[in-house]
């Protein structure tokens, strides 16, 4: 993940949260499961140690590489607890949210914060194409559900079939205090 975080501190209501940890290489870690589709705790812990030893500055749990879509929420919570425990403060753990509904996304964001995630990264909804206003409200509502936690937008048009517009990203960044950055995998340099 490239550091593209932006803070707009000119607004009086902007939350002053610590975003100093959002930098460097944040690896989207794999989720290692056994034949019963349960997270293999020993292997997951070993992978956390491996990437930290390799020099990463953060771990993204349950991003696209982490195959979030194949796990039940309780297993994601268990996996996050394992990764946060194993990271033991050496690097921050980010939590990837890739749910279609706003309600489920808010529930996952709250669960992630409760279990030690330093930030959340939110993919735009897949399998449908929301209007501008629907997408704006989706991201805003999720951010407001965890107001003291940094939130990164995740633009992945290859997975969802549409891109986040520059106008949408700019409006969210200016109007929602804890939306502080974005991971963009569009490959479109005009989006930066």
Where do the PLM segments sit?
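Compositionally biased, low-complexity repeat tracts
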Residues: 7-9, 20, 59, 177, ...
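Active-site beta->alpha loop and helix N-cap motifs at the rims of alpha/beta catalytic domains
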Residues: 18-27, 32-163, 169
